[in-house]
Swiss-Prot record:
Keywords (A to Z) from UniProt: ATP-binding, Cytoplasm, Kinase, Nucleotide-binding, Transferase
Family: Belongs to the cytidylate kinase family. Type 1 subfamily.
GO molecular function: ATP binding; CMP kinase activity; dCMP kinase activity
Intracellular or extracellular location(s): Cytoplasm
Pfam families, sorted: Cytidylate_kin
Top-level division of the source organism's lineage: Bacteria
Catalysed conversion reaction: CMP + ATP = CDP + ADP; dCMP + ATP = dCDP + ADP
InterPro entries recorded: Cytidylate_kin (IPR003136), Cytidylate_kinase_dom (IPR011994), P-loop_NTPase (IPR027417)
Protein's name according to its UniProt entry: Cytidylate kinase
Electron transport as UniProt keyword: no
EC number: 2.7.4.25
Length: 225
């Protein structure tokens, strides 16, 4: 059976995981899997009442939502039910809904299964929160990116502004702190670095500097699709 290469990039919101995954994917000619987008899209598809649904009903609702991954690098495209995922998932509302639903074992196991199926069929760069610890514990290369919440909020504000989405900075900072608390204190797959992950603080580093560090650890001969 062919061994696919898995590179995981974990960390809280606003540390640059998506940008790093896209650029790294372009350099290494690998698709990148945005698992945060999967959580957000699933949360929006299920609606704001999903958190209170019984496990049996929630499980049936999840089965109606499927994901597919196409392309490589910056051209990687995550599809939901055969359609591309839009900017609607980048709202803070979607982020909070996703964090709340992340407390449900049914949700985490459903998406974990899809993510592992994708990783079994191709080499990927996967970014999220618990990939190195829960989803791909045997990944060949693991990174955990962190940064000061104030800096992360400013980055998020700038990112949303570029996308034409205007939100109050203080609301974004509050949302980040709230989500950090949920992510770090949940009983199921809490946000924490894998024991064998490379830890990088991106507070005072630009993307290119972080990429250089990551590429120093990634040995190209291991890469195979």
């Amino acid at each position: 059976m062919e061994q696919h290469t898995i590179i995981t990039i974990d960390g809280p919101a606003g540390v640059g995981k998506s940008t790093l995954a896209k650029k790294l994917g372009t350099i290494l000619n690998l698709p990148y899997l945005d698992t945060g987008a999967m959580f957000r899209k699933l949360a929006l598809q299920l609606g704001n009442k999903a958190e209170t649904l019984p496990d049996s009903i929630l499980q049936e609702q999840c089965k109606k939502v499927t994901f597919q991954l196409q392309g490589v690098g910056k051209n990687s495209l995550l599809m939901c039910n055969g359609e591309s995922i839009g900017h609607e998932i980048r709202s803070e509302t979607a982020g909070i809904l996703a964090a709340q639903l992340g407390e449900r074992t049914i949700i985490r196991e459903y998406l974990k299964n899809i993510e592992q199926q994708i990783g079994n069929t191709m080499s990927i760069i996967a970014e999220g929160r618990d990939l190195g610890t829960e989803v791909f514990p045997k990944a060949q290369f693991k990174f955990f990116i962190d940064a000061n919440p104030i800096i992360r909020a400013q980055r998020r504000f700038n990112q949303l502004k570029k996308e034409g989405i205007f939100q109050d900075y203080n609301d974004i900072l509050h949302s980040i702190n709230y989500r950090d608390k949920l992510d770090k204190n949940r009983t199921i797959a809490p946000l924490e670095p894998a024991k064998d992950a490379i830890l990088i603080d991106s507070s005072i580093m630009d993307i290119d500097s972080i990429l250089k560090i990551m590429l120093n650890y990634i040995t190209i001969p291991h890469l195979s699709q």
